[in-house]
UniProtKB/Swiss-Prot annotation:
Keywords for the protein's UniProt record, in alphabetical order: Amino-acid biosynthesis, ATP-binding, Cytoplasm, Glycosyltransferase, Histidine biosynthesis, Magnesium, Metal-binding, Nucleotide-binding, Transferase
Provenance organism: Trichlorobacter lovleyi (strain ATCC BAA-1151 / DSM 17278 / SZ)
Subcellular compartments: Cytoplasm
Molecular function via GO: ATP binding; ATP phosphoribosyltransferase activity; magnesium ion binding
Protein name: ATP phosphoribosyltransferase
Required cofactor names: Mg(2+)
Length: 291
């Protein structure tokens, strides 16, 4: 049994966000511009820098045991892998991206069915072919090497299938979204044989748990305070929490200590109310993980 887990780090737009997420979860990953083999402070892991577009096939073959890539590229390659978990993060935000069907603003196209016999340009060729084939719409799908939005503007194709988070670039180029084809988030995928290996599966699950706990902690803080015991109901009534605030009596005192986890943006609203109710010694502290 191998005691090293081969992990694929997505190269490109997700690279920095992934390294930052690992750091928050407890792993230090170092990436050199001169190497495709990142360093990691875990003797049980070996990291590989791999394009998300190719992650699925390398995981399926067993070249690597597990990796992170967008679900869009896993579906594009129709990869036969185990989806361990979703991990909702991206280069811009913590929300899914969308693959959308786009035409020029003045195009008469109102739906996919209006593109019968049309030429569509995209990076997501195989998925797009399947999408239209399932709807009995005959189209010519061409691979785009980049600058896809410009092609429909220049009349080089009738429509494009492009990825977006906010749609702002599409609107800025005087283009119009016809419909959404797919929503995608990063997913952790594992090789089937690796998933059946007890040691590797346990290691994969450990990593997945800690990465997702780091995601859950983003934007959250801990708040701790002391208050008179008679104010507990009033204070816990305004204090958000994961389940219920923790309340503990102070030693030889009729005061209590109250602790809770809440969104950071709520602190500025709640602190004045806590002070008004007699709270003292209010401490706000950052969270790296919520498990």
């Amino acid at each position: 049994m191998s005691t090293v887990l081969r992990f694929g780090i997505p190269k490109g737009s997700l690279e920095e966000a992934t390294v930052d997420l690992f750091k928050q979860a407890g792993w230090q990953i170092g990436i050199s511009s001169r190497s495709y083999f990142p360093t990691v402070d875990d003797g049980e892991m070996k990291c590989h820098l791999i394009r998300p577009q190719e992650m699925g096939k390398y995981v399926e073959r067993g070249t690597i045991d597990v990796g992170i890539a967008g679900r869009d590229w896993i579906r594009e390659n129709d990869s036969d892998v185990v989806e361990v978990c979703e991990m909702v993060y991206s280069k811009v935000s913590r929300r899914p991206v969308r693959w959308v069907l786009v035409v020029a603003q003045d195009s008469p196209v109102q739906g996919p069915e209006d593109l019968q016999g049309a030429t569509i340009s995209t990076e997501l060729v195989e998925f797009t072919k399947r999408y239209f084939k399932e709807r009995n719409i005959q189209v010519n799908v061409e691979f785009s090497w980049g600058a896809t939005e410009a092609k429909v503007v220049d009349g080089l194709c009738d429509a494009i299938v492009e990825v977006t988070e906010t749609g702002s670039t599409i609107r800025a180029n005087n283009l119009r979204i016809v419909c959404d084809l797919m929503e995608s988030v990063p997913v952790m995928v594992a090789n089937k044989a690796a998933w059946e290996d007890p040691w590797k599966r346990a290691k994969i699950e450990q990593i997945a748990t800690l990465l997702n706990s780091a995601l859950r902690a983003e934007g959250m803080v801990g708040l701790k305070l002391n208050a008179p015991a008679e104010k507990v109901e009033a204070i816990t009534g305004i204090l958000p929490s994961q389940k219920a605030p923790t309340v503990a009596h102070l030693y030889k005192s009729d005061w209590v200590s109250i602790e809770s986890i809440l969104p950071e943006k709520e602190v500025r609203r709640i602190v004045p109310e806590l002070l008004r109710l007699g709270a003292e010694g209010i401490i706000e502290y950052p969270l790296s993980k919520i498990i």
